Amino acid sequence: MIKLGFGSDKETQNVYNSLKNFAKKDMFSEYSITDFEENKDRNSFRFTIAYDEDYVYSYMVWYEAGILNIEPEKEDYVTEDIAFILYPIAEMLL
């Protein structure tokens, strides 16, 4: 699991919303985002990254108490997934 702290719940919520919007847009031709599902009551969303039929990875993202949590549903995630997840966060912080 990846845990990222941003100092305040408001900052964490902004990063969460940025990542959520990034995942919803499915902007990249190299892979597709499928099965996007948001749970507003729990400040969470789940999505799947599909590179091709053999490489499909699902993630759950949520925030609480100033911490953004990113949890893969499988233990064996790939570097590209981490880059995808951290890109909008890094862009926001620049």
Q: Where would I find each of the regions flagged by the language model?
A:
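Acidic, low-complexity, intrinsically disordered interaction modules
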Residues: F28-E80
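Ampiphathic alpha-helical segments that act as solvent-exposed interaction surfaces
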Residues: V15-L19, I67-L94
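Negatively charged, low-complexity tracts enriched in Asp/Glu with abundant Ser/Thr
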Residues: M1-S44
